Regions:
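Generic alpha-helical hydrophobic packing signal
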Residues: 7, 27, 53-56
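Helix-turn-helix/winged-helix DNA-binding modules
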Residues: 13, 39-42
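Recognition helix of helix-turn-helix/homeodomain-like DNA-binding domains
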Residues: 25-40
Length: 64
């Protein structure tokens, strides 16, 4: 799942644990873990908030 890959990439590049990312974003560590495992749905807005909290920028591309 794309959201899981995005969170894993952010954590790897920023060298953050799940707990550290959770603290940055105001989410619980268990929520971050569930998103990364693909067992938790996440809205685009929440994903964007997490990415921005970690200093990134979410871009969505639509190809038709």
């Amino acid at each position: 799942y794309q959201a899981a890959n995005i969170l894993l990439k952010i954590r790897a590049e920023k060298q953050l644990s799940q707990s550290e990312l959770a603290n940055l974003t105001g989410k619980k560590q268990s929520y971050i873990a569930r998103v990364e495992k693909g067992t938790q749905n996440i809205s685009v807005q929440t994903l964007n908030d997490i990415v921005e909290s970690a200093g990134g920028k979410l871009k969505i591309e639509v190809v038709v």
